[in-house]
Structure formats: structure tokens, C-alpha cells
Amino acid sequence: MEVLENRSGDFISKEYIKQLKQSSNEAIATLVKENYNNSRTLIYILENLGYIPSTFNYQWIVDLLAYPNEDVRFWAVKNIGKLASDVFLDQLYKIATHDDSTKVRREAVSSIGRMRNNKSIPLMLEILSDPDPKIVCQAIRGLLVFKGDTIIDSTLKELVNHENEMVRSVIYKEYFAKNKNVRSALPHAETYSYLKNVVVNGDVRDVLKFVPDESIHLTFTSPPYYNARDYSIYPSYDAYLRFLEEVFCETYRVTKEGRFLIVNTSPVIVPRISRSHSSKRYPIPFDLHHFLVQMGWEFIDDIIWEKPEYSVKNRIGGFQQHRKPLAYKPNSITEYLMVYRKQTERLIDWNIHQYDSETINASKVKDGFETNNVWQICPKSDKIHSAVFPVELCQRIVEYYSYKGDLVFDPFGGSGTLGRTAKSLERSFFLTEKEPKYFEYMKTLQAKSNVFENGVTKFLSLEEFKNSVL
């Protein structure tokens, strides 16, 4: 239990504050007066004041509304709000519109809203024009208590065109989002058997035409580099981005509500065509991001994959020799894992609650998980594929973003590392791969792995897959 010492040498605890409240109407006011210059003590008193009876002398709290320390003001406002008296409406409104701390202003708006008093409605309607979207959202929250009132509803609906996306999102959810009463063809935790442990040789855009809506739980992929490999030649960078846009738009359709897409990309260098030309570096993850959020993917996290410097191409060698400014080119030891979630009005808890307790407990991540967003993992390659997913990378993604029994998808299957890893972690996989060389390579792994053994994994042409669906 935290205990503070006041100026008189007495110790202050929750119990002590409770005793003072009960012993005398003026006792707390005296304690505050004695410690007026000690903001830490004042905050402790305000935090632990608890229930405030109607007979309580609250003038000392009102006096603290102008205190220099914002945390003291915040807790003073919070305690004034407990009184739920419209006597304080004008005072709280003044704080909500004039205090120089967003934290204090937001709490003042919250206190006005918690009164649930018709007298507060005009004040909260005025606050909707505040330039700070956090304050506006707090006012919206207070006004939604009166949802159904014609004036309030019409005023709030107009905010769907508000400049701030946070405000627009709140209003859209409350007034314009379609109610998802129509149930999906399958329960959230389930998927179609003909998609489980299947590898299809074909263009992912053609394959996904035969995949039902909301059938994938997790997508993790590394798109082909723009014109940096012989198997990925595009007429222009714009054409490359449009190709990825098509792929991830269809991926969005087949992804279950509120589930994740993780895209592994990095800026790529296209070599110069001659000594009289410079090489070109394309910021793929940053350019792709725009398309993803536009189609409805919600950005959640950026994870940095850090590789050992010895494993990457040496770009700094020339500079190490001449040290001339402007020619500095550091070695690129990072790639991005951009984490997105399919847009939904539901919280993550809803997704979790779609599973039974046995699955939830069995899927819990074990000790030793990564706690920050910089992951140090060595890259992998082999004689067939020069850019292979490290197993450790796949393990983390699959364990952190899916449950046992889920269907994990990679639209650019490559050598099939994600599929093998998913299966070893008791998930199912669905892979597509356009290049026959890599498709055949995955088939050869049947003899080396009990994951891709006969009877477990189906290797299908596009036509065979189409027939299995139809």
C-alpha cells in the first residue's frame, strides 16, 4: 500500500483519507491546505478520495481547478464530476474550452457528459466545433446518451464528413455501419475443407476467384520484388503496385472479419543500366501502404526485421574508401513487416471469443515471445529460391496472429516455408504460387518432410483447384 508523508510528518494513506472524511467535514480541506505546495500529495489525496457525499465541503476541490499542475487539475475535475451537480456545468464548460491541457479539457467534457442532464446538451453541442478531435470525440460520447433525439442525431450525423478520420469513424459506426446480422456461411473459427493444406499452381488473382468470402484467418506474405528478380518483371512501377493492389483487394474479400494481413517488404534497388546512369530505389512498403488503407485494411503495427550486416549487400564499401559527403549509402539490414487488420466495428475481443476455451488455451503464446517491434532474425536462401522466409519469422507470425485450426494463406508461396510452419503449429495452410519451378520444388519436399507428405497436402493446377471447389 502506497503511503505518503505530509509536511507535518504524518503518513497519508487511503485509510487515513477515509478516516478524515468520516471524522470531520473540514478535515480533508485542512489536509489539502497544509500540503497545498506539494502537488504529489494533492494528487494522492484526489486519487483516493472515493465517494463524495452530498454534505461534503467541496470548495477546496473547486479551488484546485486553477492549480498550476495539470494532474492536480485533472483529478480535481474528475472529483467535481462525481458530484454530478449541474451547479458546476458552466465552470466545467469553461475548463473544457479554455484549459491549456487536453487531458484536463477532455476530463471536463467527460464530467459534463456523465451528468446525463438535458442542461448539458447545448454545451456539448457547442464543444463539437472544438479544433481538437479528441475533445470532439468525448463530446460525441456524451451526446450519444441522448441518441434518438432528433436534433442530436441530425447534428451528429453531419460529422460523418468531419475533417478528422477518428471523428468520422465514430459517427459512421453509430449511424451508418451496416448491422452484421447476416451470418457468414461458416462460423468464424472454421473454414472450408477444400482449402486446407492446398498448394495451387497459378496466378493468385485467378485462384482467388474461386475462394469464398471470409474463409482465410491470416495472410502472411512477401510479394515479389519489383524487377529485382528474373521471375518478377513488370512494365512499370505503377503496374507493379496495381498488381499488388489487385492481389490484396481480393485477399481482403476472402479474409475473415477483423483478421490480419502481414506484408513483408522493403525498399528495393533496381541496378543502373550503365555507368552514366544512377540506380533507382523504390519505397515499396510506403507506396503500397496507401493502397492497402484505401481498400479497407486498417494499419496496426510496423515490425522491423533486422538482419546481420554480413548477410546483406555491401553498399557502403565505396564510401568507406573516399568518405566524400553526399555519396553515403548505408547497408540495408532491415525489412518491414507491415501489420494490417481487416476493417471492422468489432474489437479484437470479439475475434478471440469466437473460439472455445480449449482452443484459446492451447494457442496461448509460450514464454520467450518477442516484446518489441525489432526482430533480429538471420535471413535464409537456398539453391532454388533466393528469398526464403526464415522458419523463425513464420513461427512468430503464425503464433502471434492466429489460433490452432486456423487457415493461413500465402499468395506468393515460394518454397512453402509458411505452409510447413503453419502445419507444424497445428494450423492449416493455403498457398498459391505462379512459378512452376517453385511449385515443383514444394512437391519434392514431400519426401523430406512429414508435413508435405502424400495424403496430407494437395498440389493442384488452377483447373484442378477450380474443379475441387465447384
Label the model's feature ranges.
Residues 154-164:
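TPR/TPR-like (Sel1-like) alpha-helical repeat modules
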Residues 141, 165-195, 199:
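Basic, amphipathic N-terminal segments that precede the first structured/catalytic domain
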Residues 3-22, 30-33, 40-55, 60-66, ...:
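Structural detector for internal amphipathic alpha-helices that build alpha-solenoid repeat scaffolds
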Residues 93, 157, 172, 293, ...:
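Class I S-adenosyl-L-methionine
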Residues 183-207, 448-470:
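S-adenosyl-L-methionine
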Residues 69, 100-101, 107, 132-134, ...:
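Core catalytic lobe of class I
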Residues 144-148, 165-172, 176, 284-288, ...:
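Class I S-adenosyl-L-methionine-dependent methyltransferase module
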